[in-house]
Amino acid sequence: MIPGEYKVKPGYIELNIGRATCSIIVENHGDRPIQVGSHYHFAEVNPALKFDRQKARGYRLNIAAGTAVRFEPGQKREVELVALSGARIVHGFRGDIMGELEANDE
């Protein structure tokens, strides 16, 4: 084996199979690039990103763990989101939820 070498099986790696997903259009209205990580609660991202935040509640980007999506100023793109799993308790981020998602859905 060569140091740093990867040995992977042929084919595709499927992520989040069977999980609820949705697609939304996101536009960066800011004057700086905005990068969003794979496990960030998407409804709470930077306010300069304009999209349907209610639709994004309880979802994150449907991308591989540890990766991110970058939105350049003025850029508009469609992204796929995947439902958060587990206990669906959200703390931190921008502080909009701070607890159970379903308890805050009023």
UniProtKB/Swiss-Prot annotation:
Coiled coil stretches, renumbered: none
Signal sequence residues: none
Keyword set includes Ion transport: no
Disulfide bonds: none
Biological process, per Gene Ontology: urea catabolic process
Keyword field: Cytoplasm, Hydrolase
Gene3D superfamilies, A to Z: Urease, beta subunit
UniProt subunit comment: Heterotrimer of UreA (gamma), UreB (beta) and UreC (alpha) subunits. Three heterotrimers associate to form the active enzyme.
Homology family: Belongs to the urease beta subunit family.
UniProt protein name: Urease subunit beta
Gene: ureB1
